[in-house]
Structures are given as structure tokens and as C-alpha cells.
Regions:
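Internal, hydrophobic cores of structured domains that mediate oligomerization or house catalytic pockets
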Residues: 27-34, 44-89, 114-118
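Nuclease-adjacent, charged terminal/linker segments that flank catalytic cores
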Residues: 1-47, 51-53, 251-254
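Short catalytic/ligand-binding loop motif for oxyanion handling, primarily in non-cytosolic enzymes
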Residues: 24-25, 84-89, 141-143, 189-191
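Short, flexible loop/turn elements at secondary-structure junctions
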Residues: 19-21, 82, 119-123, 137-139, ...
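Active-site metal-binding core of divalent-cation-utilizing nuclease and nuclease-like domains
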Residues: 4, 71-132, 152-155
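Core beta-strand-centered patch of the WYL/Sm-like small regulatory domain
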Residues: 50, 57, 61, 65, ...
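Surface-exposed cleft-lining segments at the edges of enzyme active sites
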Residues: 42-48, 85-87, 98-108, 139-148
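Non-catalytic C-terminal interaction segments of nucleic acid-processing enzymes
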Residues: 141-254
Length: 254
């Protein structure tokens, strides 16, 4: 067992995959990398990493269960998207990474963004919504002037925004469009992110970034009007649900 990091309530127990378990999964046909040192990987799994990973898993499970109530809507989660990526991307070791270069302080700055999860909702008419999910645990700076060596929300916003303006998402993922969903820890942090977004984008692409918290999702459901953005509050992820502003469809699923 790797850990249990909640103080109250029914705490989930987290177990690591050891060599024997990996061997069994491989024998059952799962794609398990045999060269990995699972003991070392488990030892490196500290509490912040576990908390972040569990929060991602919780969000994906909420989405999966919520979408079951909407028959005809398919959910493609992360690696399920890979077969639909351009051929060159499918061959890459890091197919989910968007790399961009843009001017900053008189020099060209190269950065990359990798979503915590990439996913698509595919509707009965084969239109779809594409989302990059980011989980913010409240530990990273929202705004940092150090873009070269330090992680920050600003750096992620810059990466996604310039990837969008340079159409990197279309080149790498084959997406005609996408939105970034950020789950964070408080309303005040959302407001700080919205301020950072406005400074980064200059007010362009206001509907590209949406934000929510666990409290909002508990009240409205993860698909419902729990999301807020630069254009306003009360935004739903599904077109069939009440929303303050419908999300435009991204493109037709291949």
C-alpha cells in the first residue's frame, strides 16, 4: 500500500503495482512495459503525486458516470484518442505534448504543455467537444515571471494559448478546436486565474478556458453549470443541459 492521504471520512487506500502484478497483467494481454522498475516507481510516489493522481481519477470517473445518463454520447479518454491522432503523432513517445515557441522578453521562448488528461465527448451526429483537463492543487504560483525554469498557471496558459493560435492542436492531435478545463481549490484562485488569463491572452479566445471547484461540481454536477470563464458563469459541458452559453462544437469525429 502506497498511502492514504485524507484526514477524515472513508479514505481511499492506494496500492502500487509490483513486479509480480505487472507480470500477471502482461500475461493477461495488458500493455505493460517490462523494462520498468516498479519498486523504484512506487518509492517515488509521494503524497503530492498521489493526491494529484487521485484527483484526476476522481474527475474522470465523475465524467464517465455522468455521461452514462446521456445515451448516445461517447466518452474517449486520453489513450483512446491516440488511434485518431495524425499518423506522425501516433509514432511519437509523447503524443499528448503540445510544444510552442513565441517571443518573450526579446527572445524566443520554447515551452510545452501536457494535459493531465485529454478527452472528447462524441455525440450521435459525430460532432464532438474536445477538452484538456488540468488539476490544480493550489500549490503552484498563478503568476510567475520566471517562465524558463519554474512551473506556474501563467506558463500553462501561455502554452495552451499559443498552441491554439499556432494551430498546434490541429497539427498534433487532429483537433479543430479544444477547451481547457481547470479544476482548482477555491473561488479566489479562480479569480486570480481569470486575471492571469486576461493578461496572457489580451482578452482573445475568452471561452477557451473554463474553471470549476469540487464545491461547484457537488452542487451542479460535473457536466452541469458548474463551470465559469471569462465570458461568464453557469456554463455546462453538454449542449443538452441548461447553460448560460452553449459551447460551440469542435469538429466532426472521424
Amino acid at each position: 500500500m502506497l498511502g492514504s492521504f485524507f484526514d477524515e471520512g472513508n479514505a481511499p487506500l492506494i496500492y502500487g503495482l509490483a513486479k509480480k502484478g505487472a507480470r500477471l497483467l502482461a500475461e493477461q494481454g495488458d500493455d505493460i512495459a517490462g523494462h520498468l522498475d516498479w519498486t523504484t516507481k512506487n518509492a517515488r510516489a509521494k503524497v503530492p503525486f498521489l493526491a494529484h493522481t487521485m484527483t484526476i481519477a476522481d474527475a474522470i470517473l465523475k465524467l464517465q458516470f455522468a455521461l452514462k445518463a446521456h445515451s448516445g454520447t461517447a466518452f474517449l479518454d486520453h489513450h483512446e484518442l491516440r488511434p485518431f491522432f495524425p499518423e506522425a503523432t501516433q509514432k511519437r513517445a509523447d503524443p499528448f505534448r503540445l510544444s510552442v515557441t513565441f517571443p518573450h522578453d526579446g527572445r524566443q521562448l520554447a515551452i510545452g504543455v501536457v494535459p493531465d488528461r485529454l478527452m472528447s465527448f462524441v455525440y450521435p451526429d459525430n460532432t464532438r467537444h474536445n477538452f484538456a483537463l488540468e488539476i490544480d492543487m493550489g500549490t503552484a504560483d498563478v503568476w510567475s515571471n520566471n517562465l524558463r525554469t519554474k512551473s506556474s498557471i501563467r506558463k500553462k496558459l501561455l502554452g495552451y494559448f499559443h498552441a491554439f493560435t499556432q494551430r498546434r492542436h490541429q497539427e498534433v492531435w487532429g483537433f479543430h478546436g479544444f477547451r481547457v478545463l481547470t479544476l482548482t481549490v477555491s473561488e479566489s484562485r479562480i479569480q486570480n486565474m481569470l486575471k492571469a488569463q486576461k493578461q496572457v491572452t489580451g482578452g482573445l479566445a475568452p471561452s477557451m478556458f473554463l474553471y470549476s471547484t469540487s464545491e461547484r461540481i457537488a452542487e451542479h454536477g460535473i457536466l452541469g453549470p458548474a463551470w465559469t470563464g471569462a465570458n461568464g458563469d453557469g456554463i455546462s459541458l453538454l449542449p443538452s443541459l441548461p447553460t448560460s452559453q452553449p459551447l460551440e462544437f469542435d469538429h466532426v469525429h472521424p
